[in-house]
Amino acid sequence: MIPFSNPSASYQSHKSEIDSAIVHVLDSGWYVLGKEVEAFEKEFADFHGKSLHSVGVANGTDAIALCLKSLGLGLGDEIVTTSHTAVATIAGIEQAGCSPVFADINP
């Protein structure tokens, strides 16, 4: 097998910082929201320059639903997506009140 990536190498170079952050969060008891999430959202927005805000969400389904809702999309709107996707994609579309429309990928 040809290796696709080596996340362990990246982890090893930042191991002490990552481990310390994980222990800090676990010790605080704040797994959702909390100071670390707030700091991450601010740093993420700053990193992207023109972004005024960023919002951390629990998963990709919530991210898709919030993006669609922020665009004013909802009931009666159709979202074209690939038929070769995870169920979470469809869940996000339907959570926003939209209807998925499947399209084949044709290279």
What are these regions (language model features)?
Residues 1-70, 74-75, 95:
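Conserved PLP-binding active-site segment in aminotransferase class I/II-type PLP enzymes
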Residues 69-107:
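PLP-dependent aminotransferase-like
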